Amino acid sequence: MRVKGIMRNCQHLWIWGTMLFGMWMICSAVEQLWVTVYYGVPVWKEATTTLFCASDAKAYSTEAHNVWATHACVPTDPNPQEVILGNVTENFNMWKNNMVEQMHEDIISLWDQSLKPCVKLTPLCVTLNCIDKNITDWKNTTIIGGGEVKNCSFNITTSRRDKVHKEYALFYKLDVVPIKGDNNSSRYRLINCNTSVITQACPKVSFEPIPIHYCAPAGFAILKCNDKKFNGTGPCTNVSTVQCTHGIRPVVSTQLLLNGSLAEEEIVIRSENFTDNAKTIIVHLNESVEINCTRPYNNVRRSLSIGPGRAFRTREIIGIIRQAHCNISRAKWNNTLKQIVEKLREQFKNKTIVFNHSSGGDPEIVTHSFNCGGEFFYCNSTQLFNSTWNGTDIKGDNKNSTLITLPCRIKQIINMWQGVGKAMYAPPIQGQIRCSSNITGLLLTRDGGNSSSREEIFRPGGGNMRDNWRSELYKYKVVRIEPLGVAPTKAKRRVVQREKRAVGTIGAMFLGFLGAAGSTMGAGSLTLTVQARQLLSGIVQQQNNLLRAIDAQQHLLQLTVWGIKQLQARVLAVERYLRDQQLLGIWGCSGKLICTTTVPWNASWSNKSMNQIWDNLTWMEWEREIDNYTSIIYSLIEESQNQQGKNEQELLELDKWASLWNWFDITNWLWYIKIFIMIVGGLIGLRIVFTVLSIVNRVRQGYSPLSFQTHLPTPRGPDRPEGIEEEGGERDRDRSVRLVHGFLALIWDDLRSLCLFSYHRLRDLLLIVKRIVELLGRRGWEALKYWWNLLQYWSKELKNSAVGLLNAIAIAVAEGTDRVIEVVQRICRAIIHIPRRIRQGLERALL
């Protein structure tokens, strides 16, 4: 019977073991994913950063005092690389592009810096007595009317401030205005004296634009849209990455965009909002239109002393004169307008397009203003914008001449485009001036009014130089490269396994760099990561302070705007690299491109499978999906690495147990002897204490202490039957033993008693655990059998019910089918018997 019971128990244990093994296999089938760090992933985010310039200034001009100061730029890359980004769609917005704002600020700074050491013309803000200058034109005819040039005399301080003498100078009519309230029409003043500080451009300053390449520092990149019909806003599917832009000439002009880039296929018109007439329309031409400008007459510069160390440079006109003018091919211009009209009609629902002259404003806006050979031309563009287009037919241009000649006027006192309250005096240029430029774009404004009108009127615009820069930077944007990426993988870092300890590290994260100085070394070690990060932040802050100081004192350091940008770009690149390397070091991933961690992947971050992530998503798409959880993942990796560091430290402290040979070291033996003596002493002490307590207890019960030789009764074991001992004695369950003699015997008896006690208690505990396990197994097995029987019963009932239902349905269907067949048969018989019934009826009728 016992053998059968053992076999039944073994069967139960076998079944239980099989079930547990199956459950373990099912649970282990679920793959555990772990966070893996990748360095160098192709991920970027939109950013604003300090760009620096690259230019080949020597190839364009040897003049060291060019206003653009491009000699401070780095040389251009002879082999620029452009990487096409396949399967990438990126959004661009030319109207909200920080590159435009940065270029605008740079050009303003360059102009201000170039004019800063030049002479202020405040002493010339005096009363001028002016008369018209008699000029001979190319027909040898004296011209007095019109007064294009004024000969003005004035009192001026010489090299000695207490001495004044009379001088004269020639001014253009546009540069002087009559003094108000003065009836004498010959009294004038300089036009900007009451509103601006006039600075005379230095004699060696040149305004010839040199192509400037804007470059991104290390850690950043410039994305370029290569869609040939890109309108400046929205998604771009043909994207590439470059380190520098193409060469951009910072041409300061209004109405017409000069010497820029061309559209690759057809003309493109761009506007932030075509329905808003306050928004400028930028027209990007696909073919340039040449404009040739000339100032025919000859000038000779003369210098006037206007104070100690100051000189005012004026002119003398020698020889014949023609009015300054510009020539444009009429056929090319009309063909260009025709293509522009086609694009405008697409936007404005096939309305009649009308081009009209500027509606008024400052001379810079009303005319086409630009710099030609150092002189500032203001050309009347009415002939360019004076036509009506109904479809592709032009009205209003009936002239047969092949050239359009724009009359131009020259100003020497220029309203600075950088801001209000600034003006510049451009010294006269000697000799004849000729310049040839290419019109590559237009700036247009649209009249508002009745939207139901059949006409749309467009006028030349400009004045906001940001639109000039925007026409070249529309296809670029700056992004910050994020080389650190995290993704789930099946790989886990093999580390020293140890339970985490609940240490208050969260509070330590908010300590400052020196906040842990008064803490213990153990508590301070928890803030090492924080201290490293704070240290880098301090370095970055110190560099930023240095840059601000340099920027504020650049006039003393003789640094150009480009020099400041070079320094900023280099510092920024170092900061970016240090930040990434610091994070890799904190995570224990220094020098690794792929670094596994012990952080389990949380499905709440992304519940996509491995195949969906690695086979279907790009790094950019993956980064957008987990962007909200990146900081959490970073903090978990950091905590995991900190715990790993503590585990390794504790492991190293236990490293002396790695070799058993160390156990035989003399120092270890002395330690073993010390421990043995302490144990023996403790046992002896416990023996003495228990003996004293036993004696005291017996004395309290009324017994007197006996000799240690007295036999004491000891309880008989339950496995010993009652009986007579070998030497006789009473028939009870007790036996007497003598107390041991000697020190070693006493120790041995105590150790034996302790071991027996431990053995009995452990055996009892194991028996209890065994009974509990058997009881739970038996109850569990009975419960499983009950549920199995219940499942079989209900399965059988459901089966019988289903069979009965099917039988009933089959019987009902069969009976119904039989009845239908019977009815059909009767109908068919009746139809078949109709002729017979007719015949029988006829026979009866005949009888």
UniProtKB/Swiss-Prot annotation:
Post-translational modification note: Highly glycosylated by host. The high number of glycan on the protein is reffered to as 'glycan shield' because it contributes to hide protein sequence from adaptive immune system. Palmitoylation of the transmembrane protein and of Env polyprotein (prior to its proteolytic cleavage) is essential for their association with host cell membrane lipid rafts. Palmitoylation is therefore required for envelope trafficking to classical lipid rafts, but not for viral replication.
Site, as annotated: Cleavage: R501, A502
Sequence segments annotated as region (V5): 451-461, 453-461
A GO term, aspect molecular function: structural molecule activity
Region (V2): 152-193
GO annotations of cellular component type: host cell endosome membrane; host cell plasma membrane; membrane; viral envelope; virion membrane
Motif Di-leucine internalization motif, chain ranges: 846-847
InterPro entries: Gp120_core_sf, Gp160, GP41-like, HIV1_Gp120
Stretches the record annotates as CD4-binding loop: 358-368
Parts forming coiled coils: 624-658
Membrane topology (Extracellular): 32-675
One Pfam assignment: GP120
Positions of disulphide bridges: C53-C73, C118-C202, C125-C193, C130-C152, C215-C244, C225-C236, C293-C326, C372-C435, C379-C408, C589-C595
Positions of region (MPER): 653-674
V3: annotated span: 293-325
Keyword Zinc-finger: no
Ranges per topology, Cytoplasmic: 697-847
Transmembrane segments: 676-696
Lipidation (S-palmitoyl cysteine): C755, C828
Motif YXXL motif per record, residues: 703-706
Gene Ontology terms: biological process: clathrin-dependent endocytosis of virus by host cell; fusion of virus membrane with host endosome membrane; fusion of virus membrane with host plasma membrane; positive regulation of plasma membrane raft polarization; positive regulation of receptor clustering; viral protein processing; virion attachment to host cell
SUPFAM superfamilies hit by this protein: gp120 core, Virus ectodomain
Assigned protein family: Belongs to the HIV-1 env protein family.
Miscellaneous comment as given in the Swiss-Prot or TrEMBL entry: Inhibitors targeting HIV-1 viral envelope proteins are used as antiretroviral drugs. Attachment of virions to the cell surface via non-specific interactions and CD4 binding can be blocked by inhibitors that include cyanovirin-N, cyclotriazadisulfonamide analogs, PRO 2000, TNX 355 and PRO 542. In addition, BMS 806 can block CD4-induced conformational changes. Env interactions with the coreceptor molecules can be targeted by CCR5 antagonists including SCH-D, maraviroc (UK 427857) and aplaviroc (GW 873140), and the CXCR4 antagonist AMD 070. HIV-1 lineages are divided in three main groups, M (for Major), O (for Outlier), and N (for New, or Non-M, Non-O). The vast majority of strains found worldwide belong to the group M. Group O seems to be endemic to and largely confined to Cameroon and neighboring countries in West Central Africa, where these viruses represent a small minority of HIV-1 strains. The group N is represented by a limited number of isolates from Cameroonian persons. The group M is further subdivided in 9 clades or subtypes (A to D, F to H, J and K).
Protein name: Envelope glycoprotein gp160
Organism: Human immunodeficiency virus type 1 group M subtype B (isolate WMJ22) (HIV-1)
